[in-house]
């Protein structure tokens, strides 16, 4: 079991190294365990932010647009997973970047909708790839 945990930790560390260098927040840690924990936390926070913005946007939409947003988000998740996959494993740096881009896009739509200028075509738009 310890070998499995060590292997997973090492793999996660290697996959997330680009993310850590991009943000620089995890460079201060000396052990690979601490760096892995730090990087995993950054990634999880970005994913949580995406889910929060998505939920907020759904909350201001009418039912027909909620359905369109759900369908578009499912298609985006497939895009993200396929575009960030390398040799059977997920490229966490890519996943982080793509998540942040989607979060920004959804946040822009949320601002528009809250301002009363919600444009249906942008909610359903598949603006990636």
Predicted segments — roles?
Residues 21-129:
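N-terminal alpha-helical modules
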């Amino acid at each position: 079991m310890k070998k499995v945990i060590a292997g997973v930790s090492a793999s996660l560390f290697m996959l997330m190294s680009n993310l850590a260098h991009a943000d620089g927040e995890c460079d201060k840690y000396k052990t690979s365990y601490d760096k892995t924990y730090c990087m995993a936390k950054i990634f999880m926070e970005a994913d949580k932010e995406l889910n929060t913005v998505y939920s907020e946007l759904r909350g201001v939409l009418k039912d027909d647009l909620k359905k369109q947003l759900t369908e578009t988000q499912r298609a985006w998740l497939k895009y993200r997973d396929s575009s960030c996959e390398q040799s059977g494993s997920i490229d966490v740096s890519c996943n982080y970047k793509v998540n942040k881009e989607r979060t920004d896009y959804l946040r822009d739509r949320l601002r528009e909708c809250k301002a009363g200028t919600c444009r249906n075509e942008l909610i359903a738009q598949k603006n990636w790839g």
